[in-house]
Amino acid sequence: MAAHALLSPSSAHRWLNCTASARLEAKVPDQSSSFAEEGTLAHAYCARGLKKFLGLPTDGEDKEIEELDRYHTGEMDECVEGYVAQVLGKYRSSLIKTHDARLLVEQRLDFGGYVPNAFGTADALIIADGLMEVIDFKYGKGVRVEAERNPQMMIYALGAYEEHSLEYSIERVRMTIVQPRLANISEYEIGIYDLLAWAENTLKPRAGMAYKGEGSQVPGDWCRFCRVRGMCKALAEDCLNTAERFSDPRLISPEMMAREVLPRLSAVKTWVGEVEEYALRQALEGQQYEGYKLVEGRSVRKVTDQDGLAAALSEDFSDDVIYKPRELRSITDLERLVGKKRFAEVGSPYISKPQGKPTLVPESDKRPPFNSAEMDFKDIEVK
């Protein structure tokens, strides 16, 4: 997606729910990060793998790989291989049913008929009679992404259908998100008429409001990646008013904890961090906050000349005293270096994984309920 596009498919979950957010975000420049660059590199490897299979040129991907290859790891290779295999498996299945099925890689799509001045690039499309496939690769592992009624995927599906519906008799769309670092392959299938009804009744009117900056600011889980979340008044009021929702300010019942408090914890914690970061950034740029001042934070001493310090200390102490013992890199680092599969092959006999610390999550979380010997045989006493 072009960086300057106002209503991008990747942020559709946000501007569909909070139509005011798009114009507010446009006032704040987007900042790149090492995570974004890492994802760009992984996408380039994915596209190059598929294009090589199709015999297509890979000049653009080669350039990106050359520029960003400092992020390349064995883990990335495994993720790319898994994605390419997934796409090609779907493509071969489509060819059995539609002999002229097409696999399109990094396909530019136009959905301006539904979202003003909007276009985007789909990672992979398989165009065939009957069932069309839309496949999206996500290298991030911070948030698990599901395909069910995912607006980004549905917008891509619309663009693909608009472009290819005259060539193929498309009746349904299967949308697949491949998120290998979370072992997540999520699929969702929808009929074309249902997709078009959603586009006319929901997407088009909400996108029109978002493009004009109309509507109220509506806080929700879509605030997570909003560029104005640290200064959004609606989100601030929502977080600050959380405690005031309780009928009894002295005690919180289990029912109230489940209904009012726990669902808000993640959003409130994230908001607090964002406000701190935003306020500090503004203060560094000269903004004055009454009752507050900038001071120098805690500093950690650093050795500027390790060889020189070691030589000075070696006059009185042996090497085994002044040097730390050699130690292995962390398991995560080793997996990234050699790849998860290879590391599991050679390293599993030497690694154990204890039971994880219990944590409260919504019922919708796909992990099994926590169970321990203590919970099986004794009541839990909370002090």
List where the protein language model places each region.
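Hydrophobic/aromatic-lined pockets within catalytic cores
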Residues: L50-L54, Y139-G142, A157-S165, G208-Y211, ...
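DEDD superfamily 3′-5′ metal-dependent exonuclease/proofreading module
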Residues: T40, G49-L50, L54, D59, ...
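Mg2+/Mn2+-dependent nuclease catalytic core
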Residues: E37, L41, H99-G208
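Extended, charge-rich alpha-helical segments
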Residues: T270-K383
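Metal-dependent nuclease catalytic cores that hydrolyze phosphodiester bonds in DNA/RNA
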Residues: M1-M132, R172-R174, S186, L265
